[in-house]
Amino acid sequence: MLTCIARSKRAGDESSGQPDDPDSKNAKSLTSQLKDMALKASGAYRHCTPCTAAQGQGQGQGPIKNNPSSSSVKSDFESDQRFKMLYGRSNSSITATAAVAATQQQQPRVWGKEMEARLKGISSGEATPKSASGRNRVDPIVFVEEKEPKEWVAQVEPGVLITFVSLPGGGNDLKRIRFSRDMFNKLQAQRWWADNYDKVMELYNVQKLSRQAFPLPTPPRSEDENAKVEYHPEDTPATPPLNKERLPRTIHRPPGLAAYSSSDSLDHNSMQSQQFYDSGLLNSTPKVSSISVAKTETSSIDASIRSSSSRDADRSEEMSVSNASDVDNEWVEQDEPGVYITIKVLPGGKRELRRVRFSRERFGEMHARLWWEENRARIHEQYL
């Protein structure tokens, strides 16, 4: 049953004593009922909380409460409040949806950068960096220091090839010099090196080798653990002086040993390695790439390079190539583990350093060469 709403009279209305049109009242009440039904059908009525302000206003107005049509007015007011709340919720949901969409548009860029950083980290061998949100992300650019030195060859001029080793601390180490047989003989090669020593050292930034800056590799052990490599320290060429004068050599050569001709001194320790260090047997052929390839019978330098399988075999060879008097005047001193020094007493009572032997177990070629450069002065002062 529809309720009737009282209508106030208008001033100056001629028909003020007559009641209002019932059709308009019925239309208003019908409209309010339709609104209530629509809200209930949409489900918004369940989520709406009663408006305290509306209740306060309804309770505070006494005439409306006592009026028989106050329930209809209250229902209209509540329906209006429900529409406002529903409209506000829809606006907030639209705003939240727009914010989520904007975040989703930004996330692919962040994720793309993060994936790119992870791929770079994986390719560089490092661990996968953390998220790109700024929490301790590792820089994907990684500089990997190589543990093993690199060897490279430079052709200084036609027929001259120099092998260098790049040092970790900077600079290069001169390892080997090769001369073409078609363009150089031994004397020409020695003269070329004496004339171009300073230029090569400066041009290729050759540094002095040290144990701290460059780890010396130890060669694999031979089958015989007592095998030793020996060379004569008195034959080691000295570093050329500034005026490049050639130093005379006076070396006593035991009879029966092979000899090489050397009128010029070779001026670098790498050349010492080529001339005075060989891991082969006694009858092995010298390397073709070495400067000490040419053999002559007129010699002032003893370059006998020998490697015996044991200490007894080494002594037997010394007996076969030396006189008995020489053996009686020679003895071996162990300076440190793996280093054996052979000393000979000359007829005048003066001592001579005949050879230094290094154990293969403790010394490689470069290690032995470096040890001799560092301890040469001490050995001469201590034993001679």
Swiss-Prot record:
Expressed in roots. Its main location: nucleus. Residues 221-235, 309-318 have a biased composition (Basic and acidic residues). The keyword Oxidoreductase does not apply. Disulfide bonds: none annotated. It is found in: Nucleus. The keyword Repeat applies. It comes from the Eukaryota. Residues 150-205, 329-384 form the BRX domain. Keywords: Nucleus, Repeat. Residues 260-270 have a biased composition (Polar residues). InterPro entries: Brevis_radix_dom, BRX-like, BRX_N. GO terms for cellular component: nucleus. Belongs to the BRX family. This is Protein Brevis radix-like 4.
